[in-house]
């Protein structure tokens, strides 16, 4: 019983250490991740608004 409890405790400790390491790295890189997600979204919105501003035909604007 003591061996399995020790093994369980060690396993949980390793899982917690892995999760904490990922959290620490993500916390430090949050700005970079935010930049990678934010600017493509801004460019998509601005291109869409530009197409609306220029009164482009439906055929001239790419659709999905």
From Swiss-Prot:
Subcellular location(s) per record: Membrane
KW Transmembrane (keyword) present: yes
Residue ranges crossing the lipid bilayer per the database entry: 30-52
Keywords: Membrane, Transmembrane, Transmembrane helix
Cellular component, GO annotation: membrane
Membrane-topology descriptor: Single-pass membrane protein
Protein name (database record): Uncharacterized protein AF_1301
Species name: Archaeoglobus fulgidus (strain ATCC 49558 / DSM 4304 / JCM 9628 / NBRC 100126 / VC-16)
């Amino acid at each position: 019983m003591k061996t399995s409890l020790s093994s369980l405790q060690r396993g949980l400790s390793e899982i917690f250490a892995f999760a904490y390491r990922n959290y620490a790295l993500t916390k430090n890189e949050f700005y970079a991740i935010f930049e990678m997600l934010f600017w493509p979204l801004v460019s998509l919105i601005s291109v869409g608004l530009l197409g609306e501003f220029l009164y482009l035909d439906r055929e001239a604007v790419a659709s999905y």
